[in-house]
């Protein structure tokens, strides 16, 4: 059974139809990459998976997004609970700059009412180890998170996301602002994280999609102002070497987009 399933998903911002008729499945403990030209809706779909797009006034979804068979848009489902179960790492690292490294990691736990200092310290260490950051920061946990390098800040944000023990981790271009060395560190981390988490990543870097993902979804749009759509999804090797759709092949080979 798929961990995540989108059935006839259409996404709107007020009267604007942003994405149309997306159907896809994401297996548990795998990495799925979303690729496609700017404006095709891949980040919009990503944000709809944990209801983050709803912070935009007038945004809504038609269709179903199923997590372990349950529609996350069901009438009795709490969006905050959805965001705890489905974590998000954004394009720009966004640690709380004046908060200590340790407090950054456990901010979500504290927000949900956890006060046991021993547990908070244990979770902070476990999460920093999980984000391959512990050895670099273990002697300065009380220092501000804003003092870390860009790559370290992004891994700190990943540690913060996994501290609340989500089942799915969404990543919206997590390496776009990073140098090649920091990018490699995050990519290595993604390979390790999929042992425990289901990951969906949006990337403009097709080489990155090829390196880190098990399956790839290609999105496109017919023209500016038209809805984005899912053109094709399949095993990453097949999408990059022998896609079913000419549109996919043209994008990957650099003929458009």
From Swiss-Prot:
EC number(s) stated in the UniProt entry for this protein: 7.3.2.1
Membrane topology: Peripheral membrane protein
Gene3D superfamilies noted in UniProt: P-loop containing nucleotide triphosphate hydrolases
Catalytic reaction(s) noted: phosphate(out) + ATP + H2O = ADP + 2 phosphate(in) + H(+)
A Pfam family per the record: ABC_tran
Subcellular location: Cell membrane
Family matches, as SUPFAM superfamilies: P-loop containing nucleoside triphosphate hydrolases
Entry annotated with the keyword Iron: no
Family per similarity comment: Belongs to the ABC transporter superfamily. Phosphate importer (TC 3.A.1.7) family.
SUBUNIT field: The complex is composed of two ATP-binding proteins (PstB), two transmembrane proteins (PstC and PstA) and a solute-binding protein (PstS).
Protein name, per record: Phosphate import ATP-binding protein PstB
Species assigned in the record: Corynebacterium glutamicum (strain ATCC 13032 / DSM 20300 / JCM 1318 / BCRC 11384 / CCUG 27702 / LMG 3730 / NBRC 12168 / NCIMB 10025 / NRRL B-2784 / 534)
């Amino acid at each position: 059974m798929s961990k995540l399933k989108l059935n006839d998903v259409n996404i709107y911002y007020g009267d604007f139809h942003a994405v149309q008729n997306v159907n896809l499945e994401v297996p548990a403990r795998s990495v799925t990459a979303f690729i496609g030209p700017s404006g095709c809706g891949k980040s919009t779909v990503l944000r709809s998976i944990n209801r983050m797009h709803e912070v935009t006034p007038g945004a809504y979804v038609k269709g179903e997004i199923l997590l372990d068979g349950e529609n996350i848009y069901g009438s009795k489902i709490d969006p905050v609970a959805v965001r705890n179960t489905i974590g998000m790492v954004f394009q720009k690292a966004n640690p709380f700059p004046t908060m200590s490294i340790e407090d950054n990691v456990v901010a979500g736990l504290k927000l949900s009412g956890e006060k046991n200092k021993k547990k908070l310290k244990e979770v902070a260490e476990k999460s920093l180890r999980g984000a391959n950051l512990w050895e670099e920061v273990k002697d300065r946990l009380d220092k501000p998170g804003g003092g870390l390098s860009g790559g370290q800040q992004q891994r700190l944000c990943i540690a913060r996301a996994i501290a609340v023990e989500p089942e799915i981790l969404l990543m919206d271009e997590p390496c776009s602002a990073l140098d090649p060395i920091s990018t490699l560190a995050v990519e290595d981390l993604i390979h390790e994280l999929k042992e425990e988490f289901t990951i969906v990543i949006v990337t403009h870097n097709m080489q990155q999609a090829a390196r880190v993902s098990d399956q790839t979804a290609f999105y496109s749009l017919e023209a500016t102002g038209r809805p984005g759509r899912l053109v094709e999804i399949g095993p990453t090797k097949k999408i990059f070497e022998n896609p079913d759709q000419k549109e996919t092949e043209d994008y990957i080979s650099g003929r458009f987009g």
